[in-house]
Amino acid sequence: MGIRRYKPTTPGRRGASVADFVEITRDHPEKSLVRPLHSKGGRNVHGRITTRHQGGGHKRAYRVIDFRRDKDGVPAKVAHIEYDPNRTARIALLHYLDGEKRYILAPVKLRQGDTVSSGVGADIKPGNALPLRNIPTGTVVHAIELRPGGGAKIARSAGTSVQLVAKDGPYAQLRMPSGEIRNVDVRCRATVGEVGNAEQSNINWGKAGRMRWKGRRPTVRGVAMNPVDHPHGGGEGKTSGGRHPVNPKGRPEGRTRATRKSSDALIVRRRKQNRRR
């Protein structure tokens, strides 16, 4: 993937960039693997906003991705590399030898015409999925399960990867993108390689309108509102809000994650914490 930069013909084009899509081999999805995706606009069944800054955007169709990679012993050919509007990564359409078709996340160096497989006997090459116990130490992997058979949960975004650093009994130690080292059951599956489309993080969207096309609405600070709209609103002149950050309903917001979780026992080394200024 590369990035194409626009010339400054308008204020919105100045500094803006877009992916060149050179790796894409087809511009329409596989019909049997598409499902309708209904836009909720951040509302619940009562019509009340439960998630702010969502709404609008281009209509999308959901591509069903195979995150379990449980079709063992059947080789598949990469028929196409496609764009997926629902995620930052590209997806690869696989044609299995028995006629079945599935989508997977497209890793780096996976090309149209390549062959991939899954299972204990699969080779260690990009796109193949194996249990962690069968992957050599030091291998870079992505799309990792947290529970055996539960489907991939870790390292699914564009450009992300996890390194298998050690194996100790029933657990494999993985170095996360954040630097955290975590124990994961060796029976969990992972896909070899790094998720493709790594340059996606370098795209400059250029104007607010492109964010609206993606379904992201403006983020307005609470201190810029009136008291009727937000607990931080009002006051004479500029104010700091006068209390710990809360959402419009008054519930605490930001840095509210539980300090003790059952899964913390699986963390071998914490990620480096950024000191708040």
From Swiss-Prot:
GO terms for molecular function: rRNA binding; structural constituent of ribosome; transferase activity. Residues 37-57, 268-277 have a biased composition (Basic residues). It holds the Pfam family Ribosomal_L2. One of its GO terms (cellular component) is large ribosomal subunit. Residues 35-57, 222-277 are annotated as: Disordered. Signal peptide: none annotated. Keywords: Ribonucleoprotein, Ribosomal protein, RNA-binding, rRNA-binding. GO terms for biological process: cytoplasmic translation. SUPFAM superfamilies: Nucleic acid-binding proteins, Translation proteins SH3-like domain. The keyword Ribonucleoprotein applies. HAMAP family: Ribosomal_uL2_B (MF_01320_B). NCBIfam families: rplB_bact (TIGR01171). One of the primary rRNA binding proteins. Required for association of the 30S and 50S subunits to form the 70S ribosome, for tRNA binding and peptide bond formation. It has been suggested to have peptidyltransferase activity; this is somewhat controversial. Makes several contacts with the 16S rRNA in the 70S ribosome. Belongs to the universal ribosomal protein uL2 family. This is Large ribosomal subunit protein uL2.
